[in-house]
Swiss-Prot record:
Main location: plastid
Transmembrane segments: 8-28, 41-61
Subunit structure, as described in the record: PSII is composed of 1 copy each of membrane proteins PsbA, PsbB, PsbC, PsbD, PsbE, PsbF, PsbH, PsbI, PsbJ, PsbK, PsbL, PsbM, PsbT, PsbY, PsbZ, Psb30/Ycf12, at least 3 peripheral proteins of the oxygen-evolving complex and a large number of cofactors. It forms dimeric complexes.
Pfam family, one: Ycf9
Matching InterPro entries: PSII_PsbZ (IPR002644), PSII_PsbZ_sf (IPR036512)
Keywords, comma-separated and alphabetical: Chloroplast, Membrane, Photosynthesis, Photosystem II, Plastid, Reaction center, Thylakoid, Transmembrane, Transmembrane helix
Any GO BP: photosynthesis
The name this protein goes by in its record: Photosystem II reaction center protein Z
Compartmental location: Plastid, Chloroplast thylakoid membrane
Similarity comment: Belongs to the PsbZ family.
GO terms for cellular component: chloroplast thylakoid membrane; photosystem II reaction center; plastid
Length: 62
């Protein structure tokens, strides 16, 4: 169970880092938002899901 928690936290950190870099780039590009809207929403949905997964796994471990 601890390995699953550690992998979920690692995935959350990686996803957060990717979103911190990619979202400003999407907004800065002239046509980026209309072309990459689905990618940003998918990344945000993944991030929210990982936050809930980490919270659930944390409550099971503690």
């Amino acid at each position: 169970m601890t390995i699953a928690f550690q992998l979920a936290v690692f995935a959350l950190i990686v996803t957060s880092s990717v979103l911190v870099i990619s979202v400003p780039l999407v907004f800065a590009s002239p046509d980026g938002w209309s072309n990459n809207k689905n990618v940003v929403f998918s990344g945000t949905s993944l991030w929210i899901g990982l936050v809930f997964l980490v919270a659930i796994l944390n409550s099971l471990i503690s």
